[in-house]
């Protein structure tokens, strides 16, 4: 009988990526199979996020529910990982002594040994250190789960914005070697992945070492990923304005695989608030980046992050943010009311903004961006859009769900053999959170590159001399 593993994940796409790697690692090392039923699980892992308010209490509430299961089934292993584990490791040991394993984002590769050790030790096993990029050397080969895949290319952040815990929970910026990133993506492409999303807390700060000792820039990496057979779409998240350099913008001019959609957080449109946040750019500098991007790629759409109610934010500061939103014409956003994160400088800033004012500002901001997003969606009506078919529709299992370049879900009628392929659809209706389309053409009628695996490519160019020594022509 196989052992069962349950992983509950909160937070960003990096956490989702980490959780998938935990599952692969424990399956490869110990044969654990995933389950969604806590009662079935032999190992319960909680991958946490400390960005939002009351993150710690949310963790302890979940652990309390799992303690009930452990009381009934004493052999169950409970583990806590992610950013809250890094921040609150000692506190978790004190308040929840029944937790067996505590690990950070950079030590998840040690999970098999930690779980094994916890089964013989009375005290919780804890490792929340920052061993740089070691975890990627210990993970099993990537396993595709559909036509899209996330690939982490760097970890941590060195910007130390005053409101953010990431540098304290994930460490400073460390980039994976270029060859490792390309090899992982090539492996995924061989398994049918067509779209890759490059991940990092500050992804465009990527500076990956190459085999010859040189450093690969993010712009160079984008072009190299685009050259991999089978990869027809590239996304990346999350980027920072400081590192959004002209060489990256130039990639938008000559690399069609890079989608015409960018998430570029700005947080505020007020220069005064940006200074208090320790954001190293002004609103005008941010708009300058957007102008250059739209010159390189006129149809690009932009999404962003916003924090309202930051300590000291005045009505004028907020109106500056609203002006930026309208000037840039953002398509989407992740927007939140400021919540102080323990251990960050902004947690000590005095704040006398009434809660009702914060809520009203957030509502106004979200309504404005939602209206802009709906306008963009309506402009797509009656147009043809190239979409990647991701799977069955979540609303109607007899239909298919696909995604546009600008990150909109399109539901349409089509056969299951289209899953994992690109198709062209005509947009026939627009809704708040999705579009409806009609199938126009399938991939066989498109002029896409043929997918040739490395094995097939080498077989085509293999030449042997009289001694049987093979050579290959790239």
From Swiss-Prot:
InterPro entries found in the cross-reference section: Elp3/MiaA/NifB-like_rSAM, Methylthiotransferase, Methylthiotransferase_CS, Methylthiotransferase_N, Methylthiotransferase_N_sf, MiaB_methiolase, rSAM, rSAM_horseshoe
Alphabetical list of SMART domains matching this protein: Elp3
Single Gene Ontology MF annotation: metal ion binding
Compartment(s) of residence: Cytoplasm
All copies of domain TRAM, residue ranges: 378-441
The Radical SAM core domain, residue ranges: 143-375
Keywords: 4Fe-4S, Cytoplasm, Iron, Iron-sulfur, Metal-binding, S-adenosyl-L-methionine, Transferase, tRNA processing
EC number(s) reported in the record: 2.8.4.3
Catalysed reactions, as listed in the record: N(6)-dimethylallyladenosine(37) in tRNA + (sulfur carrier)-SH + AH2 + 2 S-adenosyl-L-methionine = 2-methylsulfanyl-N(6)-dimethylallyladenosine(37) in tRNA + (sulfur carrier)-H + 5'-deoxyadenosine + L-methionine + A + S-adenosyl-L-homocysteine + 2 H(+)
Keyword Disulfide bond attributed: no
Keyword Iron-sulfur among record annotations: yes
Cofactor note: Binds 2 [4Fe-4S] clusters. One cluster is coordinated with 3 cysteines and an exchangeable S-adenosyl-L-methionine.
Main location: cytoplasm
Residues binding [4Fe-4S] cluster 1, per UniProt: 12, 49, 83
Cofactors that this protein relies on: [4Fe-4S] cluster
PANTHER family hit by this protein: CDK5 REGULATORY SUBUNIT-ASSOCIATED PROTEIN 1, MITOCHONDRIAL TRNA METHYLTHIOTRANSFERASE CDK5RAP1
HAMAP family in alphabetical order: tRNA_metthiotr_MiaB (MF_01864)
Subunit description: Monomer.
Similarity comment: family membership: Belongs to the methylthiotransferase family. MiaB subfamily.
The name this protein goes by in its record: tRNA-2-methylthio-N(6)-dimethylallyladenosine synthase
Organism of origin: Vibrio parahaemolyticus serotype O3:K6 (strain RIMD 2210633)
